[in-house]
């Protein structure tokens, strides 16, 4: 619906998809903490990254019917915007990890921080293979974000037991 009135519908998607970070933190701790808010914003940055890639698949077709998206807004500058979203994602998720794991051991903190770091490498791989005119490639990159999300979860799970 947002793509009918804004060039940034991916922000609305991010707001909806990532609210679980706020909910889970509050359910677990009994209060909303700043690491959850930072994780939420980092999740929105990640949504902007992967859904801009996805939106490039049909950017030419949706232009014909007047639908808006970040892919159309950024156009030939999409790679630079994706780079910014990648950096914001990794930095914000890393900051959230620091806030959430500050009372854990140094080893647990280092392992947990490996999650956003490794996720960043995966997003960089996507960026390196990004071609706005290659629809099958765009689908492959978009779908690889399932793995991008699992990477930090695996690191966090290991850190939890340290």
Q: Where are the regions that the model predicts?
A:
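Multi-pass alpha-helical membrane architecture of UbiA-family
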Residues: 1-162
